[in-house]
Amino acid sequence: MVLSANDKTNVKNVFTKISGHAEDYGAEALERMFTTYPPTKTYFPHFDLHHGSAQIKAHGKKVVGALIEAVNHIDDMAGALSKLSDLHAQKLRVDPVNFKLLGQCFLVVVAIHHPSVLTPEVHASLDKFLCAVGNVLTAKYR
């Protein structure tokens, strides 16, 4: 999926607003994913999955940190996320569909906290970006 110049601008603008909330927004997206799609919990058997868990907050911060890294290298996401792609494909063996599920939950979190920012055009750009990140993370599965 190719991001247009306008998509890239939209995504960068969204992340300037949310980057200071990485831990909270990431944790909220994970909690939503675990609640809405319970089978995703199987990848976190060692985590305390309760609301407010330090483990979920820490992992949420990592998730949003990776998204920020992708934004910062939006023209070379594959290079920026290569090690993360290796980890998820070869060691963790996360089902690729889970990246899409988490992306949907992340969109909901952005919509809740920044409804005026998430216009239909920005929503489309952010969705394309999250799909592109998912594609990068699953590229090494093949």
Curated annotation (Swiss-Prot):
It holds the Pfam family Globin. Gene3D superfamilies: Globins. One of its GO terms (cellular component) is hemoglobin complex. Red blood cells. GO terms for biological process: hydrogen peroxide catabolic process. Keywords: Heme, Iron, Metal-binding, Oxygen transport, Transport. O2 binds at H59. Heterotetramer of two alpha chains and two beta chains. Belongs to the globin family. This chain occurs in hemoglobin A, which is the major component (60%) of adult hemoglobin molecules. Involved in oxygen transport from the lung to the various peripheral tissues. This is Hemoglobin subunit alpha-A.
